[in-house]
Amino acid sequence: MKLHEYQGKEILRQFGVNVQDGKVARTPDEVRQIAREYGQPVVVKAQVHVGGRGKAGGVKFSPTEDKAFENGEKILGMDIKGLTVNKVLVTKAVDIDAGTEYYVGMIVDRNVQSFTLMASAEGGMEIEEVAAATPEKIIKHRVDPVTGLRPYEAREVAIRAGFKGNLNKIADMMVKMSEAALKRDAVLVEINPLFVGPDGVPLALDTKFEIDDNAMYRHQDLADWRELEAEHPLEIEASKYGFAYVKLDGNVGVLGNGAGIVMTSLDVVNRAGAKPANFLDIGGGAKAEVVYNAVKLVSKDSDVKAIFINIFGGITRADEVAKGVIQALKDGILTKPVRMRIAGTAEDEAKALLAEVNSPLIQMYPTMFEAADEAAKEANAAEAK
């Protein structure tokens, strides 16, 4: 379950993390009232479960209460990547130029089967951009879920990342953040930026917090926080089909069988010069109907300009995959180019079925690299028109 910024901050506050003051507003008048209470410049921030709020105009500095009201009018009701803004967080403004911005986060790292603490001096930026351009600037440290993050480990990470200020207090914040992640069964916690002012004291200005859906039965006190209307409609629809689906910001729809192969597919799409629009795992042993529904789901995404299907058939039969894709084409659901790599069980039967259809929309390639390259070309060409 994804949490709003203000909810993530509330959890971190419960664990002793120093977070930026803020209150939630649902009307422009409430925005004005909060700004008046604070008696200083504020920032009005859209509360939606997607990234890129600032670039979309959903985060605005407001030097006066009248400007806060005006910005509240602009942001409330705004559409950001398909989600309507129904509430905003009004926070006290901070003079960013007077200090330094850092990044700290905790993720579930399946490669090492544990949590990984991440820290970077490149705060205030999307961490994915930092990872792509300068991965050496992200310091990673495995966290034992039994013992948790120890203070000396946190200080060591802060030093390696090049953090300045009161390192003991920064390390203490990292320890408390990791404690929140572990005790709340989080799959992701980020503080970005973590602001360190002239006094050296760290302050969490923005947060991301996502709790493992499979662990929500242990956190019934947070059940009321889930807002289906605040989640992406495609993610809600995917949950009805039982798909493991995550909406991303790219232009190539990605579909595969198994989390590992789908993660690899995302990397291959990036390598090909495009960006994945989603993560979609159809699971093992998927029949034609499952594939049909998966293609239907991805095709509904207006961001998707081409679809990359990457299947290695074991218990998933390649001919069942082909049947599902072909049926979607026949029903008029599939209107975007599909570039496929299918190997394994019933591979020859799948090739025969697709050859019989002989549609330019559906093309097979011998390797996933070739299929991803072609999908990327199709998607980028469509966007360039």
UniProtKB/Swiss-Prot annotation:
Gene Ontology biological-process annotations: succinyl-CoA metabolic process; tricarboxylic acid cycle
Keyword entries, A-Z: ATP-binding, Ligase, Magnesium, Metal-binding, Nucleotide-binding, Tricarboxylic acid cycle
Cofactor(s) this protein requires: Mg(2+)
GO cellular component annotations of the record: cytosol; succinate-CoA ligase complex
Positions bound to Mg(2+): 192, 206
InterPro entries per the UniProt record, alphabetical: ATP-grasp, ATP-grasp_succ-CoA_synth-type, ATP_grasp_subdomain_1, Succ-CoA_synthase_bsu_CS, SUCC_ACL_C, Succ_CoA_ligase-like_bsu, Succinyl-CoA_synth-like
GO molecular function per UniProt: ATP binding; magnesium ion binding; succinate-CoA ligase (ADP-forming) activity; succinate-CoA ligase (GDP-forming) activity
Nucleotide-binding recorded as keyword: yes
Cofactor: binding details: Binds 1 Mg(2+) ion per subunit.
Reaction catalyzed: succinate + ATP + CoA = succinyl-CoA + ADP + phosphate; GTP + succinate + CoA = succinyl-CoA + GDP + phosphate
Pathway: Carbohydrate metabolism; tricarboxylic acid cycle; succinate from succinyl-CoA (ligase route): step 1/1
PANTHER family linked to this entry: SUCCINATE--COA LIGASE [GDP-FORMING] SUBUNIT BETA, MITOCHONDRIAL (PTHR11815:SF10), SUCCINYL-COA SYNTHETASE BETA CHAIN (PTHR11815)
Subunit description: Heterotetramer of two alpha and two beta subunits.
Listed name of the protein: Succinate--CoA ligase [ADP-forming] subunit beta
Source species: Deinococcus deserti (strain DSM 17065 / CIP 109153 / LMG 22923 / VCD115)
Gene: sucC
